[in-house]
Amino acid sequence: MARYIGPKAKLSRREGTDLFLKSARRSLADKCKLDSKPGQHGRTSGARTSDYGTQLREKQKVKRIYGVLERQFRRYFAEADRLKGNTGENLLQLLESRLDNVVYRMGFGSTRAEARQLVSHKAIMVNGVVSNIPSMQVKAGDVVAVREQKKKQARILEALSLAEQGGLPSWVAVDSKKFEGTFKQKPERSDIAGDINESLIVELYSR
C-alpha cells in the first residue's frame, strides 16, 4: 500500500497541530512553527473555510494521525456506521485498535510509523503468534509482545523509556521487563486525543 514518505513535520504544520508523527525525543514545536502553513513564508488566505472544507481537513488530519489512506479509511467508516453506538466514537475505536497503533500506545515504537515497521518486519507477536499485519484489529484480552530476538533493538528500548516517562494509556497494561502488554479494552472517547472532532467526519460522509 502506498504511503506518504515526505517530511512528517510538514503534515503537522498543514493541520496546525502536532499529529505525533515524529518521535517525542524533541518537541515538534522546537522544530517548526505549527501556526505557520508549509511554504516559504507560510500560505495565507483571507477566505473563510467552508463547512465542507472544515470537514475535509478534519478527515485528512485523522487519516494522517493513524497513517491510513482513503480507501481503507472509508472501510473503517462503513464498519463504524454499521456498529451500534456513536459512529464517530466507533471510528476512533477501530483506528485505536489497529495493531500498529496498539504497539505504539504500549510504547514499543516511538511513533505509529515506527510501530508499523516493527509489525511489518515481524518483530511483534499477538497471543504468541507473529503478526505482520499493521491493520489487524486487536481485541480485549489480547497479549502483544516483542519477539525475543528483537528485544535488544535500541529503538525499542528508547521508545519504551520515553513511553514510561510520558505515561501509558489506562486501557493497556504493559510489563516493560517482559516486553509485552495486554489490550485491556477498547479506549473510551475520553481516553483519545481531545483535539479530534469526529463529528465533522460523520457529517462529511453523511453528505
UniProtKB/Swiss-Prot annotation:
Molecular function, one GO term: rRNA binding
SMART domains hit by this protein: Ribosomal_S4, S4
InterPro entries noted in UniProt: Ribosomal_uS4, Ribosomal_uS4_bac-type, Ribosomal_uS4_CS, Ribosomal_uS4_N, S4_RNA-bd, S4_RNA-bd_sf
Keywords: Ribonucleoprotein, Ribosomal protein, RNA-binding, rRNA-binding
GO CC annotations on file: small ribosomal subunit
Keyword Ribonucleoprotein: yes
Domain S4 RNA-binding: 97-157
Superkingdom of the organism of origin: Bacteria
Compositionally biased intervals (Polar residues): 42-53
Matches recorded under Pfam families: Ribosomal_S4, S4
Residues covered by region (Disordered): 31-55
GO biological process, one term: ribosomal small subunit biogenesis
Function: One of the primary rRNA binding proteins, it binds directly to 16S rRNA where it nucleates assembly of the body of the 30S subunit.
Similarity-based family: Belongs to the universal ribosomal protein uS4 family.
Complex formation: Part of the 30S ribosomal subunit. Contacts protein S5. The interaction surface between S4 and S5 is involved in control of translational fidelity.
Record-given protein name: Small ribosomal subunit protein uS4
Source species taxonomy: Bacteria, Pseudomonadati, Pseudomonadota, Betaproteobacteria, Burkholderiales
